[in-house]
Amino acid sequence: MTVQEQIDEYIVGQPEPKRSEMQELHRVILEIMPGCKLWFLDGKDGEGKTVSNPSIGYGLRTINYADGTTREFYQIGLSGNKTGISVYILGIEDKKYLAETYGKDLGKASVTRYCVRFKTLKDINIDILEAAIRNGRKGKSEPGAIATGFLSR
């Protein structure tokens, strides 16, 4: 099964309205990051034990560890969870930046150092989420321009 087929199967397996909202977010992220590398992580470790929610990844970044080793991983992630949807924005160095820059304007969402978690798209300001994703794509802790929204409410 290709990565795109795994992604499609994962999204289709979500209950509504999460399914439609994840399809829309998937489309939007691909518009923001055309031609990016796609990932699908099934949430299982090497022994097949579930250790996290499955996630869709977009883009490519290299993680540098203190011991000198490196690992390739995605820049932006999308995952369904028990209470809604999580968007992961990785690579921003300042751990407070995402919450301080976008948290108060996002709406009804929980924002941590790299994750925006919300119940439904109706609860958040879509333009602000898009700006955070665009900024995360750059991998920098600097304000990104808020572009016109790709998402419809």
Regions found by a protein language model. Name each.
Residues M1-R153:
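Charge-dense, helix-prone N-terminal extensions
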